[in-house]
């Protein structure tokens, strides 16, 4: 059985036990995904700000927030928010995850794609780091390659079950 899979969709609706929230270490939310995580888990946002202010969230130091139904792994990918993901930070975080995921009782994990090979200079290097580390995890691992809002996946299902929706019903 292949433990690593790739899919399109909304990571917040993943069946995995642990969801990865890529963060910067300075307490700034600079991605739509992080904003969605922190809106869904406001107590996590408060702790995130505190940890960043106290310099407790650093490259290679992971923080698992335990939600009611999911665990959220706050995963540093850059030190300062206005930077692109930094290979050394991503590698340090993956190394720590590989060393500790069993001790943290992570049984399955979902990652967003936080690298874009052609978008910035280090994209290909970050993609290689991700692929190398993801392939050694011995738990089910899902990488969400493209964000598709959950509503976009439900509409075809509803259409199949009850027929075509009007424009008003789709909203």
PLM region spans:
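Macrodomain-like recognition of ADP-ribose-binding/processing modules
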Residues: 1-171
């Amino acid at each position: 059985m292949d433990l690593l899979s790739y899919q399109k969709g909304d990571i917040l609706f993943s069946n995995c036990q642990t969801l990865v929230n890529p963060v910067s270490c300075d307490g700034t939310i600079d991605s739509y995904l992080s904003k969605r995580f922190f809106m869904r888990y406001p107590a996590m946002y408060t702790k995130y700000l505190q940890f960043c202010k106290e310099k407790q969230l650093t490259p290679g130091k992971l923080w698992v927030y335990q939600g009611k139904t999911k665990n959220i792994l706050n995963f540093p990918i850059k030190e300062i928010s206005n930077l692109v993901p930094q290979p050394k930070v991503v590698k340090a975080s993956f190394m720590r995850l590989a060393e500790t995921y069993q001790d943290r009782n992570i049984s399955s994990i979902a990652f967003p794609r936080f690298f874009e090979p052609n978008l910035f200079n280090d994209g290909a290097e970050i993609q290689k780091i991700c692929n190398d580390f993801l392939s050694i995890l011995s738990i089910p691992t899902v990488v969400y390659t493209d964000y598709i809002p959950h509503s976009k996946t439900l509409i075809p299902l509803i259409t199949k079950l009850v027929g075509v929706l009007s424009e008003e019903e789709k909203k």
